């Protein structure tokens, strides 16, 4: 059973159109917006709030897409999420030198990446077995420029 709601997004059995029925890349901007509000935000908000209730007391589009998200048509990676080192060696160095990095890395790799991979119907990035199109750090974070 299909319904047409005012926003123009088709619903099947009351569920917004989205992965895996329609690939994220094939969705219209309106379908993506509806899916983000109906599926992604309600799934990710409690995950982030369980990790740090104070930091993520407010969880909305700006949390991940940044203050300029609307101006950028919500394209990722975000300008407001800190960039990550662009090599495994540089990342390992940060893990050793930055006290909060191990807990954030564990949270992102164990909670955020798997949840987003499932929501977008994408494999999760595994550095031991890279797969093209996998969901990983660079989907949300910019990578630092390579050192000269």
Please place each PLM-identified region on the residue numbering:
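Sequence context surrounding c-type heme c attachment/ligation sites in exported
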Residues: 11-148
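Cleavable N-terminal signal peptides
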Residues: 1, 9-12
């Amino acid at each position: 059973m299909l319904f047409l709601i005012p926003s123009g997004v088709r619903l099947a059995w009351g569920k917004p159109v989205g992965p895996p029925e329609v690939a994220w890349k094939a969705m219209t901007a309106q379908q993506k917006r509806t899916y983000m509000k109906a599926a992604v935000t309600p799934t990710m908000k409690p995950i982030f709030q369980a990790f740090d209730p104070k930091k993520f007391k407010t969880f909305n589009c700006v949390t991940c897409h940044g203050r300029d998200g609307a101006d950028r048509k919500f394209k990722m990676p975000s300008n407001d999420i800190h960039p990550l080192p662009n090599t495994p060696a540089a990342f390992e160095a940060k893990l050793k030198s930055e006290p909060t990095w191990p807990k954030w890395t564990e949270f992102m790799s164990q909670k955020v990446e798997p949840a987003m991979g499932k929501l977008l119907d994408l494999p999760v990035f595994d550095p031991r077995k890279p797969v093209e199109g996998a969901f990983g750090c660079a989907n949300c974070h910019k990578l630092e420029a390579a050192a000269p």
